[in-house]
């Protein structure tokens, strides 16, 4: 009798155990199905990413090139965005199988020199005449701001974050313009879009260029793309304190040590055309009112001494004040 009762009592226990095992099996199966779905989603995303990268790469294959290297160059009076993007985009083109070399129009400023030194990157060669060369423009699309001979150059591409300029070509070109804070941000996006790994040195100079052109993300032109680019590039570059890096490079931007008045006036100088009027403007920044006032006096004399060297109807010098990157005038 006791054995019979024991058998009867054990039946529910066996059923419970069976149900638990069955439920566990169902749960495992569902987990496996979910994991499989997740993997399929990841595989699809990776395939889509690879497809987009392949399509982006194919989009530049129709560049009409003449014999010789591609010179990647920015505007006259080169700032950090112009210098650093020329270097970074030339490296990108080389990684994509093209022969490219960065160039500048004239000597770089203290800030750009500081960024390149920190990254361990050499200053690009100066290009005296662009006539007849394969040219890829960065950070501008204006003949008035371009290197000498640009109107007779073979322009194959433009990467810019300004308005549409006067540069025109009869052949197909790579043209990319975005309304964001720095051309360097566009170049960063191109590395991602083309699936090219960003080396530490390139990440370092792109980081410096974005910080410079957006005034550490305080400029009105700053976008979410610029904000996302900074931590991404800083991690690769090994820059732990972005704000400290900006303060250091900004101090260099406000330094005119060892420069003549003519060099100061034309350090950040650009020319524009409005209708039939062509004018030029040199932009300067000072850290305080005393320095700004002294610079203003010097630039007034510099305009009188050197203004006639430029082929413009009007020429200006604008002296502003900035403290730790913040405009205070």
Cite the ranges covered by each PLM segment.
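Bacterial lipoprotein signal-peptidase II cleavage site
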Residues: 27-33
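C-terminal motif of bacterial Sec signal peptides marking the signal peptidase cleavage site
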Residues: 22-25
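Hydrophobic helical h-region of N-terminal Sec-dependent signal peptides
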Residues: 15-20
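Bacterial N-terminal signal peptides that target proteins for export
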Residues: 2-13
């Amino acid at each position: 009798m006791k054995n019979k009762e024991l058998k009867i009592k054990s039946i529910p226990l066996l059923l419970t155990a069976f149900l638990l095992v069955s439920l566990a099996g169902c749960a495992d199966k569902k987990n496996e199905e979910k994991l499989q779905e997740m993997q399929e989603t990841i595989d699809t995303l990776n395939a889509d990413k690879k497809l987009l990268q392949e399509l982006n790469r194919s989009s530049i294959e129709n560049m009409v090139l003449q014999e010789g290297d591609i010179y990647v160059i920015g505007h006259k009076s080169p700032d950090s965005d112009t210098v650093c993007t020329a270097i970074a985009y030339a490296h990108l083109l080389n990684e994509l199988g093209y022969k490219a070399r960065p160039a500048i129009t004239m000597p770089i400023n203290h800030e750009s020199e500081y960024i390149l030194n920190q990254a361990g990157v050499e200053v690009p060669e100066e290009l005296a005449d662009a006539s007849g060369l394969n040219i890829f423009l960065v950070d501008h699309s204006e003949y008035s701001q371009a290197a000498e001979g640009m109107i007779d150059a073979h322009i194959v591409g433009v990467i810019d974050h300004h308005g549409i300029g006067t540069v025109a070509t009869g052949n197909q070109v790579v043209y990319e313009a975005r309304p964001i804070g720095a051309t360097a941000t566009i170049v960063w996006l191109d590395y991602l879009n083309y699936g090219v790994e960003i080396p530490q040195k390139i990440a370092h100079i792109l980081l410096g260029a974005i910080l410079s052109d957006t005034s550490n993300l305080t400029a009105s032109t700053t976008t979410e793309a610029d904000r996302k680019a900074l931590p991404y590039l800083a991690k690769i570059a090994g820059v732990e304190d972005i704000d400290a890096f900006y303060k250091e490079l900004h101090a260099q931007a406000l330094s005119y040590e060892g420069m003549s008045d003519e060099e100061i006036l034309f350090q950040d100088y650009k020319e524009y055309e409005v209708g039939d009027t062509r004018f030029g403007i040199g932009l300067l920044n000072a850290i305080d009112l005393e320095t700004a006032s002294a610079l203003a006096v010097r630039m007034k004399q510099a305009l009188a001494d050197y203004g006639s060297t430029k082929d413009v109807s009007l020429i200006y010098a604008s002296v502003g004040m900035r403290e730790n990157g913040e405009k205070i005038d």
